[in-house]
Amino acid sequence: MRSVSDSVFRLLTVAIVLAALFLIPPELTAETDTPKPESEGLVTVHDADKAYQGLTLYPVTGKPEVHLLNMHGKILNRWHVDADRARLLPNGNLLVIHGSAWGRNEEPWENMREMIREYDWEGELVWEYKASEIVHHDLQRLPNGNTLFLLRHIIPVDEIDRETLDEKRREADIRSDSVVEIDMDGQIQWEWHLHDAADFNYCGKRSCDYLLRGDDMIREFDNWTHVNSVQLVPENKWYDAGDERFKPGNLIIMPRNWWTVIIVDRDSKKIVWEYQGDYRGGISGGHEPHMIQKGLPGEGNILIFDNGFQVHRGESFILEINPVSLEREWTYDVGKQFFSRTRGSMQRLPNGNTLISEDNTGRVFEITPDEEIVWEYKGELETSRAGRYDYDYCPQCLAFAE
């Protein structure tokens, strides 16, 4: 026989459960999405006195998210989009190419690889452009408001004089690349086609033999260039001294499969400068070559992320090159402690440090000129060319100044 106290206890228990169902905020119930954590990676090193303070844009490769992080790894803003490349704009919007190494096989992103999109701070779409082919690897909003990007260009077999190519290379279309500049109305203002500037038999330092071997053998197309970076030449001391090759507005381009960095004259559209390197066998792959801007330590030099997968066998490094003498001014090489088989980037910071995005591992770290790691963030997944922004870069960023 149940006692009165037992009955009262049971009634109280039921009342508490019912109250909980009505009082617990709906965002915490199982029927709704679980709240997103404030951080999904880990800051393992942070020397506040030596690190350059700012915000880090961290595109996640492995799920549709781009994070804006503070120096402690806290996620300050989150865009729910896949990004092969993402750039924060001065108005707080995000300029994006979809189709990352993960997203190119996931809906809806795999069907959006011809798109360039701009999202506002809240993640709402505010502008888009659909290209004629796949947009890939790199883009940027120019000071004049136009957008510069890389475009895949497939050249059909019947449009090429195949007698000038190796017999095995006459069996497939050739993949080349173009650089395109459009205005906000989507009108093309300038374009450059690599196949108009170079002979099909030229493959840079690597030579064209790789196209005929093993896994690199021609499949649906001859992957001739595989450009992965395009950057404008900024104002610089070399041009000020009269060297026309480094005229501001010229383009620094990385045809990855050539293992060669080139500069293209914007007016003549000719290749006016090349660098293949000689350090430890020369460039092997390579990403993100760009000239350090005026006012930053090393101004005028060119930084290159050398992946090192094939020539250097699993060891990446950063090169800082004097583009006139072609001498190395600085090298970051720590053997197998630093390696990203694909992708990757680096950025010279105002205090002289260098931010490095080791994309394949999801690690982003900042080093001093003496190679001391003074900030390090390890994400749960891979990333795609993370970058640091000043607190005053955009109006929304100011709220997070420390």
Q: Residue ranges of each PLM-predicted region?
A:
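Bacterial N-terminal signal peptides
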Residues: 12-23
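Bacterial N-terminal signal peptides that target proteins for export
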Residues: 2-13
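Membrane-proximal basic amphipathic "stem/tether" segments
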Residues: 7-8, 25-31
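Histidine-/acidic-rich catalytic cores in large beta-rich domains
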Residues: 28-402
